[in-house]
Regions:
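Short, surface-exposed, polar/charged, turn-prone segments marking secondary-structure boundaries
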Residues: 35-36, 49, 58
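Alpha-helical DNA-recognition elements
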Residues: 50-51, 62
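Key DNA-contact positions within bacterial/archaeal DNA-binding proteins
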Residues: 41-42, 57
Length: 63
């Protein structure tokens, strides 16, 4: 506990996006964001950075 419902949902979505990036390295960041439940790439990037400390493209490039 100790986190808001929206933070919980975003954390779940970010974990799914990380799984998708690992499983489908040729998928675009936009596609990963949409498939993870984000309607905006900027919202996805902001949530991803908040949860992981890095932006999606850096995460992908450092895997």
């Amino acid at each position: 506990l100790g986190q808001s419902f929206s933070d919980y949902v975003n954390q779940f979505r970010i974990e799914e996006s990380k799984r998708l990036m690992d499983a489908e390295p040729n998928a675009s960041i936009q596609e990963i964001a949409e498939r993870s439940g984000f309607h905006s790439i900027s919202t996805f990037r902001r949530a991803f950075q908040k949860c992981t400390g890095t932006i999606p493209s850096d995460y992908r490039n450092n895997r």
